């Protein structure tokens, strides 16, 4: 495997340091064994998320100085609008403070209580907004996506038979829309093939069902299509992205990922009537339709960053840096979700902590142990993130119980990946010492963000 060098020069740095293990243990206890509640100053390598943790380019920082902070009609909005229209092909764009704001708008605009939203695996905040507006989420991802050890391409594809069955049983009129994530975060960052997007479009169009993409990591998805799908090897990333969105009615976007910024998002659509309603609604929750809760400078940085993300040298390095970490862990026998996705390496906590049951929260405990032993912050993605069933109150029990090692864009080097891998490999050698956890505080909504735990 050829791992390309960083396609950039580092112009500005932030000093970090490793605090002693006994201090890390104390900090973890104070945080209730929840890595979200740690203070960033106490973290050596922060792999909690790739959301908003990117390093911006010199051109983006220059653009920040050109912020038009008019309350209405900011020139930076029009730059962002033109950029998104050109690269994605959608007719309308509504800016939001981040992806969650776009999810909120779409859910209110598209869902009637009692309807269904089908998608290729749930995501935490997305499903929350869907359920909050009265929908029932139905997972129609291919079964292989739930098998951590199965190494096949495009595990994020929608199962067309499942989709057809849902249409037959519930009726097309009762399906609000299809939520197609590119890539599928909780499956390990797995991509969706262009063939599957095209087939989903054909099936839904025949039944009058809308398709909205979660476009957060669309550039990473495009890279996998170029790398692995026949007929796309000679197409540019921008060409692939444009074709991807030609099979959708709109999308939600968190700019904090593939737009290479620290804040921002947007909602896209082609429907004029929906756009008119969205402009009315965004004023209530975000701000004027020409800023959506963002400063002009942030919209400018987002427009520049989205275009930079289309550069092949950037996205090749980004994906292969993640793959480098995964390959090193796999070579040492550490169980990971395969194949390695575009934004993170997911440890398979079921196999890593096979002595713990799912009710002992193995992924949560593993994430806490990784911080204590290595100074690296990661994130639980298992039963805690899945939450509870709104009707029964029982835990959702995902087949995948993982810890996500999420790589920020243009922030860390291969040397950092070596440190992460070496620490986790060492921890794996005494994995039996990892103990189960229990709740001592469980929030009612999106509990993984602020819950607290203690050892059983």
UniProtKB/Swiss-Prot annotation:
InterPro entries according to UniProt: ArAA_b-elim_lyase/Thr_aldolase (IPR001597), Beta-eliminating_lyase (IPR011166), PyrdxlP-dep_Trfase (IPR015424), PyrdxlP-dep_Trfase_major (IPR015421), PyrdxlP-dep_Trfase_small (IPR015422), Tryptophanase_CS (IPR018176), Tyr_phenol_ly (IPR013441)
Catalyzed reaction equations: L-tyrosine + H2O = phenol + pyruvate + NH4(+)
Modified sites of kind N6-(pyridoxal phosphate)lysine: 257
Single GO BP term: tyrosine metabolic process
KW Nuclease (keyword) present: no
Cofactor(s) needed by this chain: pyridoxal 5'-phosphate
UniProtKB keywords: Lyase, Pyridoxal phosphate
Coiled coil spans: none
Domain of life according to the entry: Bacteria
Molecular function GO labels: tyrosine phenol-lyase activity
Annotated EC: 4.1.99.2
Subunit text: Homotetramer.
Family under the similarity heading: Belongs to the beta-eliminating lyase family.
Protein name in the entry: Tyrosine phenol-lyase
Gene designation per UniProt: tpl
């Amino acid at each position: 495997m050829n791992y390309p060098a960083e396609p950039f020069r580092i112009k500005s740095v932030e000093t970090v340091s490793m605090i002693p293990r006994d201090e890390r243990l104390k900090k973890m206890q104070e945080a209730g064994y929840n890595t979200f509640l740690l203070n960033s100053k106490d973290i050596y390598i922060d792999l909690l998320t790739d959301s908003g943790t990117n390093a911006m380019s010199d051109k983006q920082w220059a653009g920040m100085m050109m912020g038009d902070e008019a309350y209405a009609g900011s020139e930076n909005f029009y730059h962002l609008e033109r950029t998104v229209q050109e690269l994605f092909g959608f007719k309308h764009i509504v800016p939001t403070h981040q992806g969650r704001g776009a999810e909120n708008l779409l859910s209110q605009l598209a869902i009637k209580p009692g309807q269904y939203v089908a998608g290729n695996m749930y995501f935490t905040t997305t499903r929350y907004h869907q359920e909050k507006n009265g929908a029932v989420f139905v997972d129609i991802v291919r079964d292989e996506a739930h098998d951590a050890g199965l190494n096949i391409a495009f595990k994020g594809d929608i199962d067309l038979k499942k989709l057809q069955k849902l249409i037959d049983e519930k009726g097309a009129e009762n399906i609000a829309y299809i939520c197609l994530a590119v890539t599928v975060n909780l499956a390990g960052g797995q991509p969706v093939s262009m063939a599957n997007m095209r087939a989903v479009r054909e099936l839904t169009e025949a039944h009058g069902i809308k398709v909205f993409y979660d476009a957060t990591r669309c550039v990473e998805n495009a890279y996998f299509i170029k790398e692995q799908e026949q007929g796309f090897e000679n197409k540019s990333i921008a060409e692939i992205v444009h074709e991807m969105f030609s099979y959708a009615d709109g999308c939600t976007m968190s700019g904090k990922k593939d737009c290479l910024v620290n804040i921002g998002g947007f909602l896209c659509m082609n429907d004029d009537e929906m756009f008119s309603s969205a402009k009315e609604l965004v004023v209530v929750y975000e701000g004027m339709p020409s800023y959506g809760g963002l400063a002009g400078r942030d919209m400018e940085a987002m427009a520049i960053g989205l275009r930079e993300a289309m550069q092949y040298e950037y996205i090749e390095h980004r994906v292969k840096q993640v793959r480098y970490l995964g390959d090193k862990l796999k070579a040492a026998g550490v169980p990971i979700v395969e194949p390695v996705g575009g934004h993170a390496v997911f440890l398979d906590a079921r196999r890593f902590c096979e002595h713990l049951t799912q009710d002992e929260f193995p992924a949560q405990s593993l994430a806490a142990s990784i911080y204590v032993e290595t100074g690296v912050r990661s994130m639980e993605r298992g039963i805690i993130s899945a939450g509870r069933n709104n009707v029964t109150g029982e835990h959702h029990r995902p087949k995948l119980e993982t810890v996500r090692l999420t790589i920020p864009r243009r922030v860390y080097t291969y040397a950092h990946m070596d440190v992460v891998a070496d620490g986790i490999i060492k921890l794996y050698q005494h994995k039996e010492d990892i103990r189960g956890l229990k709740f001592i505080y469980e929030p009612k909504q999106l509990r993984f963000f602020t819950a607290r735990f203690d050892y059983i």
